[in-house]
């Protein structure tokens, strides 16, 4: 079977590895010459994503490119601790969440794909007028080309288009942050501020990786560091971290996508952000899960068409539930003064008594054995 993968980011590279493991001939076409390296900001891989990477044989190599983050702490704008829970895992899971640069995850997945025998062609942009020619001769076409997916528009002309979600992110790295702020390496700190949420994590070497997620009903005209410093000048830890910034990543506007009604047509299939941008710290993990589930279906079903029907059936409900969780996550960040006060009253109760029950469905997913030979 010949497979064409459109997009060589996390979803595309993971798909290439997974499909090679079940015997497909795989070609990946990627618009950018080098989508790895320092491109993009940092991301987290939760327990479910790391187990999916284990199915690809990549978990250890990927983990080595980042650092473990065992705990997550939520803070109110006043400095009150709202919750202290395991980060991206259930308390009984011995494998900690891993944080790393997005580009380094892509590098590891692409290297694994090449070692497995996939061909990766970079610098080739696929457009609506060229995708048919690119796909000629392929038995399976995988649309892993992100939230602005050309494949999605080609597959279903009436597919929804992304819209701005009312949040943008400015992120970077700080050095020599005051000790009381940077005291605990490996803790994912999320501070709910007057303007959204501010995340900071102290890496093993003492650098602080940070991300300011700022609410703005309209697309912002100014995403500079100075503008973000001004927004957070009264915010304690965020202000201290921003004041020590030494590197910035490219700012990002967050977009949402209404449910895509058509994921596949018997030959072409969407996965990752092309099908369901979820955010909420699960974008990469969900993309890797998609890749593993798709490859398992290809191996076990009698035809590509049957495999794609099964993939759609097995992924829809989980992804829809994740999308609802992501929406609730955004709502917490965009709450007004009254909403923030209510959240500060409710969150300590939730994290103390209900967190594990509420997240068990997400973090307990185990695809680590999904591609083992039967």
Residue spans of the language-model regions?
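C-terminal helical "tail/cap" subdomain of flavin- and related membrane-associated enzymes
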Residues: 64, 79, 279-281, 296-374
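Conserved mid-domain beta->alpha element of the FAD-binding
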Residues: 8-21, 29, 142-143, 248-332
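Conserved N-terminal helical subregion
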Residues: 1-3, 46-156, 160-175, 215-226, ...
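Conserved Rossmann-like nucleotide-cofactor binding loop
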Residues: 11, 34, 148
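Conserved hydrophobic helix-helix packing surfaces used for dimerization/oligomerization
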Residues: 3-5, 26
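Histidine-centered metal-chelating micro-motifs
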Residues: 149, 169-171, 196-199, 275-276
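Glycine-rich FAD pyrophosphate-binding loop
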Residues: 20-41
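Conserved FAD/dinucleotide-binding core of flavoprotein oxidoreductases
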Residues: 83-86, 90-97, 101-106, 173-251
């Amino acid at each position: 079977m010949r497979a064409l993968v459109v997009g060589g980011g996390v979803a595309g590279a993971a798909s290439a590895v997974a499909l090679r493991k079940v015997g497909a001939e795989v070609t990946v076409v990627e618009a950018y010459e080098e989508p790895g390296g320092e491109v993009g900001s940092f991301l987290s891989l939760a327990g479910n994503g790391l187990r999916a990477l284990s199915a690809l044989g990549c978990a250890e190599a990927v983990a080595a490119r980042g650092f473990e983050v065992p705990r997550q702490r939520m803070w109110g704008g006043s400095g009150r601790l709202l919750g202290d829970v395991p980060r991206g895992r259930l308390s009984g899971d011995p494998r900690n969440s891993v944080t790393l640069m997005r580009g380094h995850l892509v590098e590891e997945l692409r290297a694994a794909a090449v070692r497995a025998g996939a061909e990766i062609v970079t610098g080739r942009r696929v457009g609506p007028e060229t995708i048919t020619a690119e796909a000629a001769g392929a038995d399976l076409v995988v649309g892993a080309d992100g939230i602005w997916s050309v494949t999605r528009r080609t597959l279903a002309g009436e597919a929804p288009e992304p819209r701005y979600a009312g949040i943008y992110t400015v992120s970077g790295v700080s050095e020599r942050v005051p000790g009381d702020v940077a005291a605990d390496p490996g803790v994912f700190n999320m501070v709910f501020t007057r303007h959204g949420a501010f995340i900071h994590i102290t890496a093993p070497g003492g650098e602080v990786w940070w991300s300011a997620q700022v609410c703005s009903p309209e697309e912002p005209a100014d995403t500079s560091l100075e503008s973000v410093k001004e927004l957070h000048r009264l915010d304690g830890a965020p202000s201290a971290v921003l004041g020590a910034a030494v590197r910035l990543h490219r700012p990002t506007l967050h977009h949402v996508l209404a449910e895509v009604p058509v994921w596949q047509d018997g030959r072409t299939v969407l996965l990752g952000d092309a099908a369901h941008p979820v955010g909420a710290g699960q974008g990469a993990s969900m993309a890797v899960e998609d890749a593993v589930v798709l490859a398992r279906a290809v191996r076990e079903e009698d035809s590509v068409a049957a495999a794609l029907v099964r993939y759609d059936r097995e992924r829809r409900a989980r992804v829809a539930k994740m999308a609802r969780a992501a929406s609730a996550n955004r709502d917490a960040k965009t709450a007004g003064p009254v909403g923030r006060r209510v959240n500060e009253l409710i969150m300590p109760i939730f994290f103390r008594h209900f967190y594990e029950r509420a997240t068990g469905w997400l973090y307990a997913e185990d695809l680590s054995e999904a591609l083992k030979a039967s």
